């Protein structure tokens, strides 16, 4: 599994400094091209950090998605959180990345913190097979229930027996 916690740390931003001051384990990954601070969180630490971020004002889950890091490698779940407040022209944002092994990809669901995670976690489950533990309705949302495998994994092979039926 991709373990970035033991490598040299990146530049620490404001949110990373706040998490560190509260003894919340994370690893800063720097900033994206828009200046959004990116942090890596371990799956087991995610529920407590999610609640801490919510209490600190990150009241909106703007986006949750997942991706296959590389063939045979770990899977990633990504969360973009935003502080939505009155009279703010430039809301504060943070990007959280959680890496899990593809053999047993489990992450605690944050549906109980941000309800907008409902369909987004289901879609990531449907496409990549990341299991969001304690999600109230984790089942396929885009693919038929009978679909085999996880279509967005880089090692996915399309089964021969699926056909387009009544597609027109």
UniProtKB/Swiss-Prot annotation:
Q: What is its EC number?
A: 7.1.1.-
Q: What does the record say about its membrane topology? A: Peripheral membrane protein
The molecular function terms in GO held by this entry are:
NADH dehydrogenase (ubiquinone) activity; quinone binding
The top EC class, named as a word, is: translocase
Catalytic activity, per the record? a plastoquinone + NADH + (n+1) H(+)(in) = a plastoquinol + NAD(+) + n H(+)(out); a plastoquinone + NADPH + (n+1) H(+)(in) = a plastoquinol + NADP(+) + n H(+)(out)
- Annotated GO CC locations: chloroplast thylakoid membrane
- First-listed, main subcellular location of the protein, grouped into a coarse class: plastid
Extract the InterPro entries matched here: NADH_DH_suC, NADH_quin_OxRdtase_su_C/D-like, NADH_UbQ_OxRdtase_30kDa_su, NADH_UbQ_OxRdtase_CS
Q: Share an example GO biological-process annotation for this protein.
A: photosynthesis, light reaction
Name the coiled-coil region(s).
none
Arranged from A to Z, the UniProt key words for this protein are: Chloroplast, Membrane, NAD, NADP, Plastid, Plastoquinone, Quinone, Thylakoid, Translocase, Transport
Question: By its UniProt entry, which PROSITE patterns does this protein fall under?
Answer: COMPLEX1_30K (PS00542)
**Is the keyword Nucleotide-binding in the record?**
no
Output the PANTHER family linked to this UniProt entry. NADH DEHYDROGENASE [UBIQUINONE] IRON-SULFUR PROTEIN 3, MITOCHONDRIAL, NADH DEHYDROGENASE UBIQUINONE IRON-SULFUR PROTEIN 3
Q: What does this protein do?
A: NDH shuttles electrons from NAD(P)H:plastoquinone, via FMN and iron-sulfur (Fe-S) centers, to quinones in the photosynthetic chain and possibly in a chloroplast respiratory chain. The immediate electron acceptor for the enzyme in this species is believed to be plastoquinone. Couples the redox reaction to proton translocation, and thus conserves the redox energy in a proton gradient.
The family annotation for this protein states:
Belongs to the complex I 30 kDa subunit family.
| Quaternary assembly | NDH is composed of at least 16 different subunits, 5 of which are encoded in the nucleus.
**Which NCBIfam families is this protein grouped with?**
PRK12494.1
Q: What is this protein called?
A: NAD(P)H-quinone oxidoreductase subunit J, chloroplastic
Organism in which the protein naturally occurs:
Chaetosphaeridium globosum
Q: What is the lineage of its organism?
A: Eukaryota, Viridiplantae, Streptophyta, Coleochaetophyceae, Coleochaetales
Write the gene name.
ndhJ
């Amino acid at each position: 599994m991709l373990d970035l916690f033991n490598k040299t740390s990146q530049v620490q931003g404001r949110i990373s400094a706040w998490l560190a001051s509260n003894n919340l384990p994370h690893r800063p990954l720097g900033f994206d091209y828009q200046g959004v601070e990116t942090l890596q969180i371990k799956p087991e630490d995610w529920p407590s950090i999610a609640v801490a971020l919510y209490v600190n004002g990150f009241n909106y889950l703007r986006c949750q998605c997942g991706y296959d890091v590389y063939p045979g490698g770990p899977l990633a779940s990504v969360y973009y959180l935003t502080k939505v407040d009155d009279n703010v022209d430039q809301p504060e944002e943070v990007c959280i990345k959680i890496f899990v092994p593809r053999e047993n990809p489990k992450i605690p669901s944050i549906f109980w913190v941000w309800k907008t995670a409902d369909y987004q976690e289901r879609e990531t489950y449907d496409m990549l097979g990341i299991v969001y533990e304690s999600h109230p309705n984790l089942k396929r949302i885009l693919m038929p229930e009978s679909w085999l495998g996880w279509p967005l994994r880089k090692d996915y092979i399309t089964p021969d027996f699926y056909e387009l039926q009544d597609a027109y």
